[in-house]
């Protein structure tokens, strides 16, 4: 880890998944979490690592009823010269 360590607790809005069909809402919610974190931490989506607790929170009520928002604790740091974001539920 380097000196550049940025940790934030943020709320990820997931209301946009309601536009998806019921069978794809939880899948879309997971990709929305990843893209939201990538945008706010200025990294590519491939550099975002999601903890299984996020997956469990999204899928808790099934595929068709993900939460409308999700509190996430995310940290950005440098690993092997590249920026990486790790996230878990807050």
From Swiss-Prot:
Any one of the GO BP annotations: cytoplasmic translation
GO MF term (any one): structural constituent of ribosome
What InterPro entries does the record point to? Ribosomal_eL31 (IPR000054), Ribosomal_eL31_CS (IPR020052), Ribosomal_eL31_dom_sf (IPR023621)
Q: Which UniProt keywords apply?
A: Ribonucleoprotein, Ribosomal protein
Q: Which Pfam families match?
A: Ribosomal_L31e
Instruction: Give Gene Ontology CC terms.
Output: cytosolic large ribosomal subunit
Query: What family is this?
Result: Belongs to the eukaryotic ribosomal protein eL31 family.
Q: What is this protein called?
A: Large ribosomal subunit protein eL31
Native organism is Natronomonas pharaonis (strain ATCC 35678 / DSM 2160 / CIP 103997 / JCM 8858 / NBRC 14720 / NCIMB 2260 / Gabara)
Identify the coding gene.
rpl31e
